[in-house]
Regions:
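Helicase-associated low-complexity regulatory tails and linkers flanking the ATPase motor
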Residues: 1-25, 30-204, 218-222, 228-317
Length: 317
């Protein structure tokens, strides 16, 4: 009954006094919808869309990493990129920086199996296996601006025995969280909702659907689709777009004694821009990518392709 709707109730309250006014705030108004557009055409006081919000630097910069890889290689990619961020933070005196990875599956059984596979992968890491993985990665790169060039260069100049020891400590079984257990929130509601705290050791989260709604974590930097199917379902990509939007929230870390709530390094020569980027690791399948981009566009999420930038060469005078 229309008389019982929230909208009708508000209108009735407004009509009680001629000087009543209503201010409405929303992040999801669909002005492209004809009915909604007609209703709000003369009522919008100020419009600040998500895409503009992201363009103005109030979010992480969302980067798509598309590759046809097996799950093991994809998980190792995410770990090496995540640890690269931590190394860059340490190089620049940024303390307590702990980037989190989300491994997203479509079935609980797969998520649990992949967590076990992940633990085995971390335990089996050696300097030789990392060098081999990065050498294969370098051969596959088709762009001079891919983040992987910097990642490969950083590890090439590092003591891999030490780095791998740090990775194995950071990603040990105690620092992995599987949120598919029905009793998780009763057991330990704190771990999932305090990932930004320095005393929370979790570096990787394995999930199916529990983090799609109402989960806000600012230090999520990598979202990895594992055992994904080459589906071009709009419903599925809409859900992914929503998750990407959540992961894009900016993490206001302190650098050079100053805390910022907007991006500072988009155009900087420093490697610090990676601390302001969310990487979404997914398959390189044309139909799926087309549908994903449509969902991201519909959600007003500004995305960039890894390696789509331009290499600038400065000329010395």
């Amino acid at each position: 009954n229309e008389e019982q709707t929230w909208e009708r109730t508000i209108e009735n309250i407004l009509d009680l006094r001629p000087d009543n006014r209503l201010f409405e705030y929303t992040a999801t108004i669909d002005l492209a919808n004809k009915d909604i557009g007609n209703k709000y055409r003369d009522k919008v006081v100020y419009q600040y869309d998500l895409k503009q919000f992201m363009s103005d630097g109030y979010s992480k910069k969302v980067m798509l990493l598309e590759a046809n890889q097996n799950d093991g290689d994809k998980m190792l990619d995410a770990v090496l990129l995540s640890q690269y961020r931590k190394l860059i933070a340490a190089d620049n005196g940024i303390t307590g920086f702990k980037p989190v990875i989300l491994f997203k599956s479509n079935k609980i059984a797969i998520s649990k199996a992949k967590q076990e596979e992940f633990s085995q992968l971390i335990a089996a890491m050696t300097p030789e296996s990392v060098r081999r993985h990065l050498a294969n990665k370098k051969v596959q790169l088709s762009s001079d601006t891919s983040i992987w060039h910097k990642v490969i260069q950083r590890y090439a100049g590092s003591d891999l025995v030490t780095v791998i020891g740090q990775i194995q400590e950071d990603f040990n079984d105690f620092n992995l969280l599987n949120v598919n257990k029905s009793d998780l929130l009763e057991e330990n509601p704190v771990l999932l909702n305090t990932l930004e705290e320095v005393d929370n050791p979790v570096r990787a989260v394995f999930a199916v659907a529990k983090v799609n709604e109402g989960w806000d974590v600012l230090n999520l930097y990598d979202i990895v689709r594992i055992s994904e199917q080459a589906s071009s379902s709009k419903t599925g990509t809409d859900s992914e777009a929503q998750l990407i939007g959540r992961g894009a929230r900016y993490f206001p870390f302190v650098y050079d004694g100053k805390q910022s709530f907007t991006r500072r390094f988009d155009n900087s020569a420093k490697d610090l821009s990676v601390l302001e980027q969310l990487h979404y690791h997914t398959i390189n399948e044309p139909a799926y990518i087309k549908t994903l981009h449509a969902s991201l566009e519909q959600a007003d999420i500004d995305v960039h392709q890894d390696g789509a930038g331009i290499v600038e060469h400065a000329r010395l005078k």
